[in-house]
UniProtKB/Swiss-Prot annotation:
<keyword id="KW-0675">Receptor</keyword>
<dbReference type="GO" id="GO:0005886">
    <property type="term" value="C:plasma membrane"/>
</dbReference>
<feature type="transmembrane region" description="Helical">
    <location>
        <begin position="104"/>
        <end position="124"/>
    </location>
</feature>
<comment type="function">
    <text>Cholesterol-binding protein involved in the redistribution of cholesterol from lipid droplets to the endoplasmic reticulum. Required to meet cholesterol demands during erythropoietic differentiation. May play a role in transport processes at the plasma membrane of erythrocytes, including regulating VDAC-mediated ATP export, and import of the heme precursors protoporphyrin IX and 5-aminolevulinic acid.</text>
</comment>
<dbReference type="GO" id="GO:0034389">
    <property type="term" value="P:lipid droplet organization"/>
</dbReference>
<feature type="transmembrane region" description="Helical">
    <location>
        <begin position="45"/>
        <end position="65"/>
    </location>
</feature>
<dbReference type="InterPro" id="IPR038330">
    <property type="entry name" value="TspO/MBR-related_sf"/>
</dbReference>
<dbReference type="Pfam" id="PF03073">
    <property type="entry name" value="TspO_MBR"/>
</dbReference>
<comment type="subunit">
    <text>Homotetramer. May also form homodimer.</text>
</comment>
<dbReference type="GO" id="GO:0005789">
    <property type="term" value="C:endoplasmic reticulum membrane"/>
</dbReference>
<protein>
    <recommendedName>
        <fullName>Translocator protein 2</fullName>
    </recommendedName>
</protein>
<keyword id="KW-1133">Transmembrane helix</keyword>
<dbReference type="GO" id="GO:0015485">
    <property type="term" value="F:cholesterol binding"/>
</dbReference>
<keyword id="KW-0256">Endoplasmic reticulum</keyword>
<keyword id="KW-0225">Disease variant</keyword>
<keyword id="KW-0812">Transmembrane</keyword>
<feature type="transmembrane region" description="Helical">
    <location>
        <begin position="3"/>
        <end position="23"/>
    </location>
</feature>
Length: 172
């Protein structure tokens, strides 16, 4: 890997590092809430998942950059421009989810992000098939995190929906 590869691999981590530094105390307290869905992974697993995803997508972007000749010419505008947009949306999700605790807004941005990642993979596929395939775990991880965001958003709207009703009663 060329030295530029290290930059591409490190770049996706800048947003999460900055968000973490600015919101560390709120993130730790948030993760201790008892109403997380049962499938929500422990904090360390969630953190390791995101670190891995960011490394992989950084490497994938490097492959695309390298296969299009390096530099920052016109052929890179769409493939890396779209990647930059989805990276920015990904960082915004962190702010909405962890700092603002706006789970509905985070969920909407995750759905937008899902579409952006699929679009990025489709554009990258003719350039570098491995780069496109490397985005698939990101889509899987987004599915998990979006389901957590949905669960938390739903619970914030209807906090008692998960409590059992007495025998014979139905919810409205």
């Amino acid at each position: 890997m060329q030295p530029q590869g290290a930059i591409f691999v490190a770049l996706p981590h800048l947003g999460p590092i900055l968000v973490s530094l600015l919101t560390r105390h709120r993130m730790i307290r948030w993760y201790d809430i008892p109403k997380k869905p049962p499938w929500c992974p422990p904090h360390k697993v969630l953190l390791a998942g995101w670190i891995t995803i960011y490394f992989v997508m950084g490497y994938a972007s490097y492959l695309v950059w390298k296969d299009l000749g390096g530099g920052f010419g016109r052929p890179l505008a769409l493939p890396l421009g779209l990647y930059a947009v989805q990276l920015a949306v990904s960082w915004a999700v962190l702010i909405f989810f962890f700092a603002a605790h706006a789970h509905g807004l985070a969920l909407l941005h995750m759905l937008l992000l899902y579409g952006l990642v699929v679009s990025t993979a489709l554009i990258w596929h003719p350039i570098n098939k491995l780069a496109a395939v490397l985005l698939l775990p990101y889509l899987a991880w987004l599915t998990v995190t979006a389901s957590i965001a949905y669960h938390l958003w739903r619970d914030s709207l209807c906090p008692n929906h998960h409590q059992p009703l007495p025998m014979g009663e139905k919810r409205d």
